[in-house]
Amino acid sequence: MLQTHLQETREQVSRLEKIVQQSVGKLEPKRSKPMAALIDEARELVDDAKNDPVRDVIILTACQRIEYYEIAVYSAVCNFAEIIGETEQFGLLKKTLEQENNANEALRGLADSANTRADRAA
């Protein structure tokens, strides 16, 4: 599941680059501070995990938190593109938003199983 989403993410980057080129030309990439904070926190929690099942839950929870953040951002820019009449950009962003929602659903299923395993290991 994570490998599939990694490939989707690469496609999303290409779509975003296309949108940026159409809108403003060239844009210098910047590191997202909120995303970096989510990743840093996840690393700390993984390092403190007491066993593998708990570590799995932490990783899946971190992935879901990242998905929630991405869904919020893509929802906002998707809505904005629709409001200002950018039909092509709206379509590209909507596809990305759908992929993020699908990834979140898949993570939810994995998290349910991981939580059960962690509970048994406790």
Predicted regions and their residues:
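Amphipathic alpha-helical hairpins
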Residues: 1-122
